[in-house]
Structure formats: structure tokens, C-alpha cells
């Protein structure tokens, strides 16, 4: 009887690990980058509800409120071309896969308001033009992470 219970528990453990493991060490992808940061069809505007709408629409308020996010109002070709700029070290690690834009880009920064709590995620919307630093991976190189706005 003890051996049978052990086998059942082991089988459940293998099943759960097989289900959870792929998301644990998941590398950032170009699809994630596009979903979280690209909004080429719109120009920066002063609508104060832009961030609230976009953060929800792009799935960044499911389960918790993402604290900060940046939307890029440029073409994918222009953003991808940044990957051909000079390499630099990533701000958040020692990886040297980052590249800085040669010119400022039109962006919208979304910041969670201090009093805001899940599930009512409320953001401030700030439009500006800034250089960005992105991490690029693959062959050809494509953006996978927005590292900084400078």
C-alpha cells in the first residue's frame, strides 16, 4: 500500500512539474516585447486614460498591477534597427546584449499611482521623447526587453 501511494504522489509531482516548469525559466520573447511595449499605430496623446486602457488591454493588470511600463509609438522596423547599434552592458545584469537608440523615440510612460491597488490599477500617463535601451537576442537580433529610458 505504501509503494502505491508513493507512486501516485510521484506521478502527480511529475505532472505538476511538467506543467509549471516551462514558464519558470522562460526567456523573454519578441512576442512579449511587442505585446508589452509596441503601439506603433497611435501617436502619443494627452488622454489621461491611455495607460489604464492599454495596460488592461495588453494583459498587464491580470493578477497584479504592473508598476511601470513604456509604450513605443514607432514602427517595428525603427525599434528593431536599434539592435544594430553599439552593444552595451545591461542595467539589470552583466549581459552585454543591450543597444541604445541613436535618436529619441516617441514614448508613453505608464506609472502606477501610489494609492492604486489591484484589482483597480490606476496609472499616470506621461508622453515624451527619450532614448531607449533595449536587450536584443537571436539571429537576426530582435528586441526582447526594454531595459531603460534615458
Swiss-Prot record:
Coiled coil: none annotated. The active site is at 37 (proton acceptor), 145 (proton donor). Disulfide bonds join 51-110, 65-121, 83-136. Pfam families: RnaseA (PF00074). Keywords: Disulfide bond, Endonuclease, Hydrolase, Lyase, Nuclease, Secreted, Signal. GO terms for biological process: defense response to Gram-positive bacterium. One of its GO terms (molecular function) is nucleic acid binding. This is Ribonuclease pancreatic delta-type. It comes from Rattus rattus.
Amino acid at each position: 500500500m505504501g509503494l502505491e501511494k508513493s507512486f501516485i504522489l510521484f506521478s502527480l509531482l511529475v505532472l505538476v512539474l511538467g506543467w509549471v516548469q516551462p514558464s519558470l525559466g522562460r526567456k523573454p520573447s519578441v512576442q512579449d516585447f511587442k505585446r508589452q511595449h509596441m503601439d506603433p499605430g497611435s501617436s502619443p496623446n494627452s488622454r489621461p486614460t491611455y495607460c489604464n486602457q492599454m495596460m488592461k488591454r495588453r494583459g498587464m493588470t491580470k493578477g497584479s498591477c504592473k508598476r511601470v511600463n513604456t509604450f513605443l509609438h514607432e514602427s517595428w522596423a525603427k525599434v528593431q534597427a536599434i539592435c544594430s547599434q553599439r552593444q552595451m552592458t545591461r542595467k539589470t545584469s552583466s549581459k552585454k546584449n543591450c543597444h541604445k537608440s541613436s535618436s529619441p523615440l516617441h514614448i508613453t510612460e505608464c506609472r502606477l499611482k501610489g494609492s492604486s491597488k489591484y484589482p483597480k490599477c490606476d496609472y499616470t500617463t506621461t508622453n515624451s521623447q527619450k532614448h531607449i535601451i533595449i536587450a536584443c537576442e537571436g539571429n537576426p537580433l530582435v528586441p526582447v526587453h526594454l531595459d531603460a529610458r534615458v
